[in-house]
């Protein structure tokens, strides 16, 4: 689960992690009033959406007087903000964060995340803050520190010193930053986060460090332990189809291709997407119907993927273990009763009750179904149908 910048900064402040003063605003008048209350002569007017790249998309502006606060707030609030993380459809800006200015002398990048390959928590830091970290990693890898932490040991001074060395900090600066990272690491672990990112982390003329931005992502499976975090959920920022799918126990993620996938099991789903890509087509979604799929959930999955107007072909790839292939077949028939299907469906069914499933589909009136003998054959059929 993701939260907004203003929510993340409130959590930071509650845990003694330095942030600049700021207030959330839901209207232009409230934005101006917040700037007045914060005081000073410079403010950042920031769009609040669950995506990065807001500045490049025009969603972050620096105002040097209250008239500019009003002008920028009126332009950003209600805009459809498109960034490299939102996709071409963008996100509607429904709230702003008005933040006090600071005398910035240097920007850094800092993140804490779970490294599944190494089975460790990893701190990633760079002297090149405020930029796309992937670009920095590609062009200047020597400017990035990657420090692994064994969760059984936790964050120690030597971890912090390794980060400070790459960032080029002096002794006093290192001491301040290491203290800040220690608090961030504790927060990350205590709140069951998947990722904590500050980009940029700034150093002021006074030599102090502040989180100028804050992005936190939490483990959905651990939210029952953190009701105060679960309350921060903003469902308006979530994809409606993904939210609806979750209500039916389906794991669905929309992508930008034209081949809809319906698969059981996350591993098989990823393999299916890989082979679709390898064949030259592009998957339109990740969809795992799970091991306990019923005809009802399969029908719902059909409804959801057919709402995507980019879809040209549906590829159903089921290996029947716990889930029975005949249930999938009945779900397909149930779905076609409620939703008109005018695009080809490639079906590969193997495993429990696969023969019964084939009989069900053969005896149906569906003329746009094509049977695949194996995964490779299915991908080839899909590619030929997409064109």
Curated annotation (Swiss-Prot):
InterPro entries: ATP-grasp_succ-CoA_synth-type, ATP_grasp_subdomain_1, Succ-CoA_synthase_bsu_CS, SUCC_ACL_C, Succ_CoA_ligase-like_bsu, Succinyl-CoA_synth-like
GO molecular function annotation: ATP binding; magnesium ion binding; succinate-CoA ligase (ADP-forming) activity; succinate-CoA ligase (GDP-forming) activity
Pathway named in the protein's UniProt entry: Carbohydrate metabolism; tricarboxylic acid cycle; succinate from succinyl-CoA (ligase route): step 1/1
Keywords tagged on the record: ATP-binding, Ligase, Magnesium, Metal-binding, Nucleotide-binding, Tricarboxylic acid cycle
Enzyme class, broadest EC rank: ligase
Coiled-coil region list: none
One Gene Ontology biological process: tricarboxylic acid cycle
Entry function: Succinyl-CoA synthetase functions in the citric acid cycle (TCA), coupling the hydrolysis of succinyl-CoA to the synthesis of either ATP or GTP and thus represents the only step of substrate-level phosphorylation in the TCA. The beta subunit provides nucleotide specificity of the enzyme and binds the substrate succinate, while the binding sites for coenzyme A and phosphate are found in the alpha subunit.
Name this protein carries in UniProt: Succinate--CoA ligase [ADP-forming] subunit beta
Source organism (scientific name): Campylobacter jejuni subsp. jejuni serotype O:23/36 (strain 81-176)
Gene: sucC
